[in-house]
Swiss-Prot record:
It comes from Peptoclostridium acidaminophilum. The lineage of its organism: Bacteria, Bacillati, Bacillota, Clostridia, Peptostreptococcales. Substrate binds at M74, C75, H76, M110, E111. This is Cyclic pyranopterin monophosphate synthase. Pathway: Cofactor biosynthesis; molybdopterin biosynthesis. It catalyses: (8S)-3',8-cyclo-7,8-dihydroguanosine 5'-triphosphate = cyclic pyranopterin phosphate + diphosphate. The gene is moaC.
């Protein structure tokens, strides 16, 4: 397997995607944030002093996707045609999923992964006053379509 972000000397480089064809691309990512049951109840009931946690986390995740190339060194600045973030509240965790879409020369996996990561960090920030033991985990790519390398779907979680 070849690392495309390394040049012949083994040093980092940004891959040249100029000769690639534009294709429709989509990526789905997931993250979890574990917390106390009381914290989940406060989020569900809108009792956090900082505001509507999930609405702010949704906007934060979208903003994160848009800024991916600013924080991931070799990531291309791409046109994002859409990002959607969903939250599933469980007894002691929130499952975050993001779907990001583009039509371009390079994939959108990093934008989807950044979206769920920033959404989880936003939840942490908004809830840390009542629950310092929260754990962000299981950040992963679930599915990607489009591009030269083909489609990918995680078999199990």
């Amino acid at each position: 397997m070849e690392f495309t972000h390394l040049n012949e000397s083994g040093r980092a480089r940004m891959v040249d995607v100029g000769g690639k064809d534009d294709t429709n691309r989509e990526a789905t990512a997931r993250a979890c944030i574990k917390m106390n049951r009381e914290t989940i109840s406060m989020i569900r009931d809108g009792q956090m002093k900082k505001g509507d946690v999930l609405s702010v986390a949704q906007v934060g995740g979208i903003m994160g996707a848009k800024r991916t190339s600013d924080i991931i060194p070799m990531c291309h600045n791409i046109f994002i045609s859409g990002v959607d973030i969903e939250f599933k509240l469980h007894e002691e965790e929130i499952e975050i999923s993001a779907v990001a879409k583009t039509r371009g020369k390079t994939g959108i996996e990093m934008e989807a992964l950044t979206a769920v990561s920033v959404a989880a960090l936003t939840i942490y920030d908004m809830c840390k006053a009542v629950d310092k033991g929260m754990v962000i985990s299981d950040i992963m790519l679930i599915k990607k379509t489009g591009g030269k390398s083909g489609d990918y779907e995680r078999e199990s979680i």
